[in-house]
Amino acid sequence: CSDERAGSTVDYACQRLTQYAQKYVNAAPESEQHLPILFNEYCTTWGLPSHENIKGILEAVKGKGLEYFVVDCGWFVEEGVHWSRSMGDYVPSDRLFPEGLGAVSDDIRKAGMKPGIWFEIDNAGPKSHVYSEREDLMLHRDGKVLTTKERRFFDMNNPDAIAYLTDKVIGQLRKYDFEYM
C-alpha cells in the first residue's frame, strides 16, 4: 500500500471514508441538530436519590457542559419499600427531600443546569395507594384489573385516570419548575 500514485494509499482511503461519513452518515435532520446533553443521576444513586447526595453530584458535574440534570426514580419512595413497588402515587419523600423538590430544582439551576425528573406514568406498583385504592383508574379485562408482574396499568382512555396523572405529573412539573421529564 505504499504506491505513490495519488489516491492509492491506505491513508487516502481512510480519509475518503471519513469524508463520506461526515457528509452522509453523520448528517442529522434539522430537528436533531441540537439535542441536549443531560445527566441522569440513576447510576450514582441506584434509585435512592436524596437532596444531600444530589448536592454532591451537582458539585461533581457542574461546568461539564450539561444542559439538564435529571432526578431519577426513588424520589417518592416510602421507608422500607423499593421504588418499583411504590410508584404511582408520586408523593415526594419528606425523608429524602426534607426541603422539598423545589429546593432540589433550585440547586440544579444554581449549578447551571435545567432540572428534570423521572416518572413512569403508565403503571403503578403494588405498595402504592393508587394500586389498591383506585382500581377504577386501571385497565380492566372481563371486569378484572389487569395485573402483570405485580404492576397495574393506568387506563389512558379513562378521563379520571388522565385527570389523576395530569395532577400528579404535570402538577409537580409545574409546582417544582422541572423542565424535563
Model-inferred region functions:
Residues 7-26, 66-73, 97-149:
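Glycine-rich, aromatic-flanked loop segments that form ligand/cofactor-binding clefts
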Residues 46-50, 94-98, 124:
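Acidic-and-aromatic substrate-binding clefts and catalytic sites of carbohydrate-active enzymes
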Residues 53, 96, 100, 160-165:
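Soluble or luminal CAZymes and related metallo-dependent hydrolases
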Residues 51-67, 103-111, 166-179:
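Short amphipathic alpha-helices and their capping/turn segments at secondary-structure boundaries
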Residues 79-93:
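Surface-exposed, active-site-proximal loop segments in enzymatic domains
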Residues 34-36, 43-47, 114-178:
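Active-site-adjacent "subsite" loops/lids of carbohydrate-active enzymes
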Residues 13-68, 72, 77:
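An acidic-aromatic substrate-binding cleft motif
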